[in-house]
Curated annotation (Swiss-Prot):
It is found in: Cytoplasm. It catalyses: adenosine(37) in tRNA1(Val) + S-adenosyl-L-methionine = N(6)-methyladenosine(37) in tRNA1(Val) + S-adenosyl-L-homocysteine + H(+). Its EC number is 2.1.1.223. This is tRNA1(Val) (adenine(37)-N6)-methyltransferase. The keyword Lipid metabolism does not apply. It comes from Dickeya chrysanthemi (strain Ech1591) (Dickeya zeae (strain Ech1591)). Specifically methylates the adenine in position 37 of tRNA(1)(Val) (anticodon cmo5UAC).
């Protein structure tokens, strides 16, 4: 779902938040509900360094920079050249230019050569298996797991995460169980799960996940906290829970 703002005189070619603007006209995937939910929800601690895998326009990095007051260095890795350039431009134009750095790279190669490790990794990853053609190769790269499979994503996150780190993703509900099964086979365990539905009368259509990794005894000791989030009430107004989660970002909240 892509958000449309109806406030007049907003800048075009992107999305205006309360404290920053995200230009996305050069990106295959525009600012949408999935990314905003993840950026607003991710549990933050006293992080050492944050990584956004497949950062696109740089939305998640900007949201996490706002939430942390720019206290933590944030790296974004993006394969698509046009998107990575736009992400860097968005970061440079934001109040947190000093703490965000964008790397135009394939995350698989980056994970094999990077020497730094991260206490928090986030991703709004490709989610469709190959099928119906997209309008462009750029959009297909952003949406389809042919470019970055979930197996490869988990492997890269495992290589780059600190021992006590956290990996957070947003996924379509239809992909979540398969993703969790893959994760468990690679010594990951979900410690937080939020099932998201557009309304109480609609089925869950996206899932927010926080995963941690460790040895067998550590993994078995992790307890899952599972909750739900409804975006709109029956009257189609944003729910109080959704407003509380996103009010620091949306102009309309």
């Amino acid at each position: 779902m892509t958000f449309q703002q109806h406030t007049p005189a907003l800048r075009t070619g992107g999305f205006t938040f309360k404290q920053f603007f995200v230009a996305h006209d050069r990106c295959a995937m525009k600012v949408g509900t999935d990314g905003v939910l993840l950026g607003a929800w991710v549990p933050l601690r006293e992080e050492t360094r944050i990584l956004d895998i497949g950062c696109g326009s740089g939305l998640l990095g900007l949201m996490l920079a706002q939430r942390s007051g720019g206290r933590f260095p944030i790296d974004g890795v993006e394969l698509d050249a046009a998107a990575s350039t736009q992400a860097a431009d968005n970061a440079a134009a934001s109040p947190w230019a000093d703490c965000i750095r964008i790397y135009p790279a394939d995350i698989v190669g980056y994970a094999q050569t990077a020497t730094r490790r991260y206490s928090l990794i986030v991703s709004n990853p490709p989610y469709f298996s190959p099928g119906v053609d997209c309008a462009s190769a750029q959009r297909a790269q952003a949406r389809y797991t042919t470019t970055l499979t979930h197996d490869a994503l988990l492997d890269c996150a495992g290589r780059l995460l600190e021992p006590d780190g956290r990996f957070c993703v947003v996924l379509p509900a239809v992909s979540a169980e398969d993703f969790l099964a893959l994760a468990q086979r690679s010594a990951w365990r979900a410690d937080i799960r939020v099932d998201v539905a557009d309304s109480a009368s609609r089925p869950v259509n996206r899932v927010l996940l926080s995963l941690r990794r460790g040895g067998e005894s550590e993994i078995n000791a992790i307890a899952l906290s599972r909750t739900s989030l409804i975006i709109r009430d029956d009257d189609r107004r944003y729910s109080s829970s959704f407003q509380a989660l996103t009010r620091d970002f949306y102009l309309s909240m």
